[in-house]
Amino acid sequence: MEFWRRRKEKGKARECFLKTGSMFLKKLIADCNGISNPIRMFSFDQISKATDDPRCSILDGSSDFTWYKGVIEGKPYSIKIYRMEEMAYNDVVLSARVSNHSGFPKLIGCCLEYPLPVLVFEDLDDYKILNERGSVGCEDAPLLPWNVRLKIAKEVAIAITYLHTAFPRIIIHRNIKAENVFLDKNGKAKLTDFSLAVTLPEGKSWIETKWSGTCGYIDSGYVLTVLVSEYTDVFSFGILMLVLLIGRPGGLLISDGRWNIPSNISECVKDLQERGEPVEPVQMKLFLDLALRCCDRSSGYQPKMIVVAKEIMLIEKVPLDSQMLENVSEDGQITH
């Protein structure tokens, strides 16, 4: 009986490989014009044993996928198993594309012997995942130190800039949010999850497609027009900046189309102080102004991500001196 069961499993795995592998190859060729990073192929048996092992533990999950910790050939890996077809192909193709950049978790390989591709990443067991308040741990945990939050914003901005500028066809992430940011054991921020990402046609700056993303992080203009551009990511990143600054979930920052945030830096500082959080008023004012510019679609002056990343680097260099606040103008520029 065991022989026939194993034979049936292998037959099913072979059938899945032909179907899943064909779709994966089609997506890969369409995305990268024949140029991609080589990744390892894992077998059905390897994934099955790794995820059935008693030592296997679930790292994190959502309604669309589940993360597992598994051991293959004596080495620990993080295994991502999807439930949605298009999302799985998107994630494996684009994760392979950016795998050598330090701003993203490293994709080691995949398995095509399941109905949907199974992604195998480097071991993420030591990684921490930001919660919806931009912190780590339980929801009421203290905020991370301000310099750490600022560093996270900078590193995520650099990763998004890479997506927007490194390839002939711009990659739009479309699901930038706190919960899609991992921190490695050295505190380095890594942006994850390409399940909703789209790649713009070469030479095009936008496409029309069904809107998708996470409530609280989605630009209302994008919902109305269904036009996706790099500014779709800029808006979502602006919300992430506000989450990191204020420590409140993205879904609570906008209510009925209106901002639900402190109207100026003084209110923001007061709010943080009342919650027992340390503050750096000068850097925080510059950071708040930049975040609001990212979210200000109506002005027509939203900055590109490369500009945002550079400005955050400059904010990092501003002296931590609260007495300088009087030298910061209303538009966020430092005066002398």
Give the label of every model feature segment:
Residues 56-63:
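Protein kinase glycine-rich loop
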Residues 63-83:
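Glycine-rich ATP phosphate-binding loop
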Residues 101-104, 168:
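Non-catalytic scaffold residues of the protein kinase domain
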Residues 3-36, 42, 78-83, 89-96, ...:
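Cytosolic eukaryotic protein kinase-like domains
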Residues 156-159, 163-166, 294:
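Conserved hydrophobic alpha-helix
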Residues 164, 168-184:
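Catalytic-loop of the protein kinase fold
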